[in-house]
Swiss-Prot record:
Keywords of this entry: Allergen, NADP, Oxidoreductase, Vacuole
Residues at the catalytic site: 159, 174, 178
UniProt: NADP(+) binding residues: 31, 33, 107, 140, 174, 178, 206, 208
Official protein name in the record: NADP-dependent mannitol dehydrogenase
Enzyme Commission code(s) on record: 1.1.1.138
A biological-process GO annotation: protein homotetramerization
Compartments it resides in: Vacuole
């Protein structure tokens, strides 16, 4: 059966996430894509399960702040996404604590700082296992629940690096993993067509602190290659996550949204 048309017709209702339960992986930093995606969903009324790998204190702090500020239920969970059993347990625990999962934002990831000849095999595997296999693990774990409930929205954080090969830095493993995430979203949009929507978001250079190790001259070169001439703030991505999480995007599946300041048009 096709996914039904929402009953709401006004934008304020279509964008509302009141009564929805949203999982966001990788939301333990003070700012960052996952944290801002979670905040955006909380602003629109969603109850949240946010995850961390090693920064328990940061995740607990974010959960407390969002709950108090937006008046929603927020709980932090530990989950190492490259382990399927942990993703499965995460979904089961959230269902036990919240009753259901409506939206899963698969955001946890790892960057790379070298090419395949200068990296070890272990470094390659670590990026692929976290960024691509980790996304698969999350998707499968929640997809079974979506299929059972016959509803759901999966939003995958990919990257503009899934569309292009970045210059001048070498990061083949990351580029390959993120290209895989984009195509995984498209494949699942078809596979899950009867019960859930699947979309991806491909950010460009975002000022989250993850690229602080990159020399300033290289970062200046990046900016010269971006039509808008700057990095984005993570807050500039919130609207995209709320859109894909909500009924405002009810006829949208298999889409990838580039948010890169125009980088990929050059």
């Amino acid at each position: 059966m096709p996914i039904s048309v929402p009953q709401a017709t006004e934008l304020k209702d279509l964008f509302s996430l009141k009564g929805k339960v949203v999982i966001v992986t990788g939301a333990s930093g003070p700012t960052g894509i996952g944290t801002e995606a979670a905040r955006g969903c909380a602003e629109y009324g969603a109850d949240l399960a946010i995850t961390y790998n090693s920064r328990a204190e940061g995740a607990e702090k974010n959960a407390k702040e969002m709950s108090e500020k937006y008046g929603v239920k927020v709980k932090a969970y530990k989950c190492q996404v490259n382990e399927y059993a942990q993703c499965e347990k995460l979904v089961q625990d959230v269902i036990k604590d919240f009753g259901k999962v409506d939206v899963f934002i698969a955001n946890a990831g790892k960057t790379a700082d070298n090419g395949i000849l200068d990296a070890t095999v272990e470094q390659w595997n670590e990026v692929i296992q976290t960024d691509l296999t980790g996304t698969f693990n999350c998707a499968r774990a929640v997809g079974l629940h979506f299929r059972e409930r016959k509803t759901g929205s999966l939003v995958i954080t990919s990257s503009m690096s899934g569309h292009i090969a970045n210059f001048p830095q070498e990061q083949a493993s990351y580029n390959v993993a993120k290209a895989g995430c984009i195509h995984l979203a498209k494949s699942l949009a078809n596979e899950w067509r009867d019960f859930a929507r699947v979309n991806s978001i491909s950010p460009g250079y975002i000022d989250t602190g993850l690229s602080d190790f990159v020399p300033q001259d290289i970062q200046k070169l990046w900016h010269s290659m971006i039509p808008m001439g700057r990095d984005a703030k993570a807050t500039e991505l919130k609207g995209a996550y709320v859109y894909f999480a909500s009924d405002a995007s009810s006829y949208c599946t298999g889409s990838d949204l580039l948010i890169d300041g125009g980088y990929c048009v050059r």
